[in-house]
């Protein structure tokens, strides 16, 4: 990222009618958004514009879920996607109240949505980019082929590009997939210095017996990943929705568009994206700190300051949707708050 206007933007923020740094993290948000929107400009932007913020929820199923390490069976992925399309989920409520465009991407559920609800096949909020009928069980074999990884990265880039070209200048990523905390935990354990037990958590609320089994299965998958690069690790233990999010992060960076990152699983996808292209980090804002093991490390590793800490562990993009008003507030103070000079305030 070209940071040549960073000092000008910071001076503009510092000259607002407030003590230096008094708006805390919001000042950092304003600086980042203004810097992103100043790319390819002749000067620092005078106004931050948030246009058509869009939530992309990436959905996929996981073969490892057959091992009974989630509170729900794999069919719930498809059932929840149907709930999203019917407008009945938490993410729909939060998108509605905050005027967020909403799309759900079928990256590879066990079956297409029309098998369950035929009339949803042509739903305007559904994007089908299926890589298969769920991944293989990564505790026993590679979750997907290298060809599926490459195609998934391409699909993710495609949906990010089409969303941006349709007028959105702020993307928000969420996810849905029974078993995907196991995949995210395995990716983190394989690609970071952390031990498996520091990466695996309770997900959406498993019991101690399931947690013990989950630790064992994740360790089995991670044992095949020694010495592998990020794309190869995605093949071994990744998820269809996770690999597409990685591709979407990479494309958002290429098109100089910020992404508001949801919780643990989306943050792990963000972490993987930075391993493939470290400059993707410049375009990421982090919505919240989740209850999941490993999320703290990801946030610290990416030098991220999450905007919220509400004890959330739902996924779906709910934390990102709840954090959007803070981005709007950061833009508003940057755009409208008086300077000491214009307000006639002496300090």
From Swiss-Prot:
The keyword Repeat does not apply. Keywords: Cobalamin biosynthesis, Glycosyltransferase, Transferase. It comes from the Bacteria. Signal peptide: none annotated. One of its GO terms (biological process) is cobalamin biosynthetic process. GO terms for molecular function: nicotinate-nucleotide-dimethylbenzimidazole phosphoribosyltransferase activity. The active site is at residue 316. InterPro entries: Nict_dMeBzImd_PRibTrfase (IPR003200), Nict_dMeBzImd_PRibTrfase_bact (IPR017846), Nict_dMeBzImd_PRibTrfase_N (IPR023195), Nict_dMeBzImd_PRibTrfase_sf (IPR036087). Its EC number is 2.4.2.21. PANTHER family: NICOTINATE-NUCLEOTIDE--DIMETHYLBENZIMIDAZOLE PHOSPHORIBOSYLTRANSFERASE. HAMAP family: CobT (MF_00230). Belongs to the CobT family. Catalyzes the synthesis of alpha-ribazole-5'-phosphate from nicotinate mononucleotide (NAMN) and 5,6-dimethylbenzimidazole (DMB). This is Nicotinate-nucleotide--dimethylbenzimidazole phosphoribosyltransferase. It comes from Vibrio parahaemolyticus serotype O3:K6 (strain RIMD 2210633).
């Amino acid at each position: 990222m070209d940071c040549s206007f960073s000092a000008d933007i910071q001076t503009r923020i510092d000259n607002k009618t407030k003590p230096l740094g008094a708006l805390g993290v919001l000042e950092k948000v304003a600086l980042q958004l203004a810097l992103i929107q100043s790319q390819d400009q002749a000067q620092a932007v005078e106004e931050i514009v948030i246009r058509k913020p869009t939530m992309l929820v990436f959905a996929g199923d996981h073969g490892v879920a057959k091992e009974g390490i989630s509170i729900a069976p794999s069919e719930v992925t498809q059932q929840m996607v149907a709930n999203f399309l019917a407008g009945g989920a938490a993410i729909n409520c939060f998108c509605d109240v905050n005027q967020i465009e909403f799309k759900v991407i079928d990256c590879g559920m066990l079956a297409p949505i029309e098998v369950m609800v035929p009339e949803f096949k042509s739903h305007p909020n559904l994007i089908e980019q299926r890589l298969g009928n769920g991944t293989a069980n990564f505790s026993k074999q590679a979750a997907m082929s290298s060809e599926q990884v490459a195609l998934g990265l391409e699909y993710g880039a495609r949906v990010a590009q089409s969303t941006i070209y349709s007028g959105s200048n702020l993307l928000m990523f969420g996810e849905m997939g029974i078993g995907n905390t196991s995949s995210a935990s395995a990716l983190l354990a394989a690609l970071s210095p952390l031990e498996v037990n520091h990466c695996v958590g309770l997900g959406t609320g498993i019991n101690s017996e399931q947690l013990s089994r989950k630790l064992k299965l994740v360790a089995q998958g991670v044992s095949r990943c020694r010495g592998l690069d990020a794309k190869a690790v995605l093949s071994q233990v990744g998820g269809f929705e996770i690999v597409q999010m990685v591709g979407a992060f990479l494309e958002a960076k290429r098109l100089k568009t910020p992404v508001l990152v949801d919780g643990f699983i989306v943050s792990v996808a963000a972490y993987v994206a930075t391993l493939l292209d470290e400059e993707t980090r410049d375009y990421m804002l982090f919505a919240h700190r989740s209850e999941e093991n490993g999320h703290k490390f990801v946030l610290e590793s990416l030098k991220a300051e999450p905007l919220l800490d509400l004890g959330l562990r739902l996924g779906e993009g709910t934390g990102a949707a709840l954090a959007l008003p803070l981005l709007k507030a950061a833009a508003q103070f940057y755009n409208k708050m008086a300077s000491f000079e214009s307000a006639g305030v002496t300090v």
